[in-house]
């Protein structure tokens, strides 16, 4: 196992800055996930750790040894690519052992290692097949197996599940999680899929335009996002936002006026919030309540009803602001499109974002955080 440290690491191509002053300490055996929209620099950071991209400025350390000028082959890292990168003319066994053969390992050692990893990944019965005879999930396991055979101290995975269908993604996600628990190796994983990030990571690094927006445990990011970008990116369906106005403040609460002119106090810190300022209220779809059990309500018109079997998602337009909210309940909700629908807003579940998009610290304690 190895630790990985990035100290003020930046990457630029000419005048174009891709990653800006990244500071991150990854502990031995930790599973870190980089997540963010396309073009945010997450794969670039992974490639710098691997040695496939030069570091423009800053220091990259593995086990407290500076790696900026160390060749990729000597860094002790293994990388799994999005495209699998398997040799089509080689068998599964030959693909998995390719790196060991290049390194001049003994034939007996190669055979033993390939057999061990193949059994771990349930590939033993496929060792004589070529990639074209494998399913997408099997090819991905071969790509992972090839990396495991080399026994790296740090695993780098660059969107390894993006080419798989939905069912296979779930299966492979579980397998990668089990693999990490079994090996206890440091894993750094890149994805644009926040579901993968939430389910796999010990900690998530959210990137926005080359900057680190927030680092934290999955539930910490979900319940206590530091800004509106993180709040909207983490969670599916994403957080609802409403324009509101601050009407009063206290040390540990802020009073806001909703679009329907109702006033409510939110249990958030009032630092940086001024009376009269236009701010944003955020609330997750599953935290909205049926109107009969809520004191604060909003009325809207049903636009779309999505019945998913295990849950219902109701898309509601608030006429006063011509803005849609998503209401999510873990059951069947029978409501017609075009009808009037009233939802409840529990104050302790609400988020408040200042005019600059930063979050007011929530004071309600969420379980598991």
UniProtKB/Swiss-Prot annotation:
InterPro entries: AAA+_ATPase (IPR003593), ABC_transporter-like_ATP-bd (IPR003439), ABC_transporter-like_CS (IPR017871), ABC_transpr_MalK-like (IPR015855), ABC_transpr_MalK/UgpC-like (IPR047641), Mo/tungstate-bd_C_term_dom (IPR008995), NA-bd_OB-fold (IPR012340), OB_MalK-like (IPR040582). PROSITE patterns: ABC_TRANSPORTER_1, ABC_TRANSPORTER_2, MALK. One of its GO terms (molecular function) is ABC-type maltose transporter activity. Coiled coil: none annotated. The keyword Transport applies. ATP binds at residues 36-43. It is found in: Cell inner membrane. Keywords: ATP-binding, Cell inner membrane, Cell membrane, Membrane, Nucleotide-binding, Sugar transport, Translocase, Transport. It is an enzyme of class 7 (translocase). It is a peripheral membrane protein. It comes from the Bacteria. One of its GO terms (cellular component) is maltose transport complex. It catalyses: D-maltose(out) + ATP + H2O = D-maltose(in) + ADP + phosphate + H(+). Residues 4-234 form the ABC transporter domain. Its EC number is 7.5.2.1. The keyword Membrane applies. Part of the ABC transporter complex MalEFGK involved in maltose/maltodextrin import. Responsible for energy coupling to the transport system. Belongs to the ABC transporter superfamily. Maltooligosaccharide importer (TC 3.A.1.1.1) family. NCBIfam families: PRK11000.1, PRK11650.1. The complex is composed of two ATP-binding proteins (MalK), two transmembrane proteins (MalG and MalK) and a solute-binding protein (MalE). This is Maltose/maltodextrin import ATP-binding protein MalK. It comes from Photorhabdus laumondii subsp. laumondii (strain DSM 15139 / CIP 105565 / TT01) (Photorhabdus luminescens subsp. laumondii). The gene is malK.
């Amino acid at each position: 196992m190895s630790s990985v440290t990035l100290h003020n690491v930046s990457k630029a191509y000419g005048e174009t800055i891709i990653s800006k002053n990244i500071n991150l300490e990854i502990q031995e055996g930790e599973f870190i996930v980089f997540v963010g929209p396309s073009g945010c620099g997450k794969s670039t950071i992974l490639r710098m750790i691997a040695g496939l991209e030069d570091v423009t400025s800053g220091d990259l350390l593995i086990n407290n040894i500076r790696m900026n000028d160390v060749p990729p082959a000597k860094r002790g890292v293994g990388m799994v690519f999005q495209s699998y990168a398997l040799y089509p003319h080689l068998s599964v066994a030959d693909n998995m052992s390719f790196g060991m053969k290049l390194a001049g390992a003994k034939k007996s050692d190669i055979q033993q290692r390939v057999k061990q990893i193949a059994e771990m990944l349930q590939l033993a019965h496929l060792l004589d097949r070529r990639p074209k005879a494998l399913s997408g999930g099997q090819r991905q396991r071969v790509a992972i197996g090839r990396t495991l055979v080399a026994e790296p101290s740090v695993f780098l995975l660059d969107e390894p599940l993006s080419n798989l269908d939905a069912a296979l993604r779930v299966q492979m996600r579980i397998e990668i999680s089990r693999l990490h628990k079994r090996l206890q190796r440091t894993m750094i994983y890149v994805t644009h899929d926040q579901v993968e990030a939430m389910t796999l990571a010990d900690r998530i690094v959210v990137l926005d335009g080359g900057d680190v927006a927030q680092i934290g445990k999955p539930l910490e990011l979900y319940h206590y996002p530091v800004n509106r970008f993180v709040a909207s990116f983490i969670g599916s369906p994403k957080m609802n936002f409403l324009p509101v106005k601050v009407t009063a403040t206290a040390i540990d609460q802020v009073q806001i006026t909703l679009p329907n002119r109702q006033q409510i106090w939110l249990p958030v810190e009032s630092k940086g919030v001024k009376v009269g300022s236009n701010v944003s209220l955020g609330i997750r779809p599953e935290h909205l309540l049926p109107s009969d059990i809520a004191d604060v309500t909003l009325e809207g018109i049903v636009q779309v009803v999505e019945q998913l079997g295990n849950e219902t998602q109701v898309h509601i337009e608030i006429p006063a602001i011509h803005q849609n909210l998503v209401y999510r309940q873990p059951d069947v909700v029978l409501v017609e499109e075009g009808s009037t629908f009233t939802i409840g807003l529990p104050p302790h579940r609400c988020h408040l974002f200042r005019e600059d998009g930063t979050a007011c610290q929530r004071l309600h304690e969420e379980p598991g955080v």
